[in-house]
Amino acid sequence: SDVYKRQGNDFASEIIFSIRRLAEPMKDHIDNNFSPLSPVQKDDFGKVSDQIIYFLRNCATMIRKNDYIGFEELIAESITLMNQLTALKKGELKRIQGQSGSTKVSMVYLNMVQEAQNVVSFTANLLKVSRKFQKE
């Protein structure tokens, strides 16, 4: 059970680091008055970010209540979110190849999507470890 505690702590730390890596480049971008995200980027990421927030809240509730009913569905949701975020990255890379939009904005956007993907992955892993820890 010490292993699960340590793994859980590692995943929680990774979530915090990913959120920091997500937020800092966006803040720098805004502070430097660089171009905003394109309407397509805002729309695409906005749709998935609402789903990510819902997923994170459900995971937090499950861990807090120590009630793992619906665990498999949440893990399936994490896989769906990861696939959606991968599709966003592919779409952005196609836009870069088509030379539409600012490369600097694209890099900030790709970083946002990657770190959001990390948050989802680490949260799903934290959920798995928490459940294993509680079963012991």
Please name every model-derived segment.
Residues 1-136:
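Cytosolic, long alpha-helical scaffolding segments
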